[in-house]
Amino acid sequence: MDERALVFSDGLTDPQISQVLALAEAATRHDGVAPLSEQALLTLRAGRSRSLLSLEDGVIAGYAHLDPAPDGAGASGEVVVHPGRRRRGHGRALLRALRERARGPLRVWAHGDLAPAAALAAAEGMARVRVLLQMRRPLQDSPLPEVTVPDGVTIRTFEPGRDETAWLRVNGRAFADHPEQGAWTLEDLRARQAEPWFDPAGLFLAERDGRLIGFHWTKVHPDPIGEVYVVGVDPSAQGLGLGRVLTLIGLHHLRDRGLPAVMLYVDESNRPALRLYESLGFTRYAVDVMYQSPPPH
């Protein structure tokens, strides 16, 4: 008879981190979609993840990441089970353990909107509350509109050591209602700057009268494919069409690097952003879903 155990940790050991990363890679190969977000992977690799492990005969069969989310929106989590150890109750056990530790409403991301995840969420009484779309467009075989920068606005690239504070200010204002992006700290920003993909030449800043009012941060994946990583416009600069301008500047940059295509993520409920991206030739490619449970009784 196999031995099962659930283990909670505020920081996994290096061997445990390696096992979880291998588990996530196996799930990606099997499902065709990565089971963990960038933020979850960053905290995992840094040894700072609040983690739940589901063990079977001493082997990590499943992993859950818990983000206590001090923004008041409730805790959030992500769950992955090794493909070879599914349908044995690991996912359900991890989900219920997350709910207990959340001590309030729990939000859980299901990357890829896969049927087994939807079935588990329904069985656990969780409601579908948010849909994140991945959209894509080709770059080399599809023309891009030219860029016209508004009068009084200048564009330059990010300078590490100079622009962090201003960037965080605009990011916080632009995403004040966004539970993940708007709460970024200097530590979060520096964690991305330390990643091998970070390139300040791909982070474009818009300024007016010497003050930052918007940005477009691009990213290049090894596939290779480019990404509209994040576009933010300060509320004081709304109405200038700056979101479209910054998006196009980044798309031209990625095209000129020779990348065949570009991707982005956008909330399905963000109708203005969806209209913008569709007008620029993006189409829907994949879906992530957030489920929410009520607090435990």
Swiss-Prot record:
InterPro entries in alphabetical order: Acyl_CoA_acyltransferase, Bact_Acetyltransf, GNAT_dom, Mycothiol_AcTrfase
Cross-referenced CDD domains: NAT_SF
NCBIfam families reported in the protein's UniProt record: mycothiol_MshD
Family: Belongs to the acetyltransferase family. MshD subfamily.
Source organism per UniProt: Thermomonospora curvata (strain ATCC 19995 / DSM 43183 / JCM 3096 / KCTC 9072 / NBRC 15933 / NCIMB 10081 / Henssen B9)
Pfam families xref list: Acetyltransf_1
Binding site for acetyl-CoA 2: 231-233, 238-244, 270-275
Self-association and partners: Monomer.
Positions that bind 1D-myo-inositol 2-(L-cysteinylamino)-2-deoxy-alpha-D-glucopyranoside: E38, E180, K219, E227, Y265
Domain N-acetyltransferase span(s) in chain numbering: 7-156, 153-297
Name the record gives this protein: Mycothiol acetyltransferase
EC number: 2.3.1.189
GO biological process, one term: mycothiol biosynthetic process
Any one Gene Ontology molecular-function term assigned to this protein's record: mycothiol synthase activity
Keyword annotations: Acyltransferase, Repeat, Transferase
Biological role stated in the UniProt entry: Catalyzes the transfer of acetyl from acetyl-CoA to desacetylmycothiol (Cys-GlcN-Ins) to form mycothiol.
Annotated residues for binding of acetyl-CoA 1: V79, V80, V81
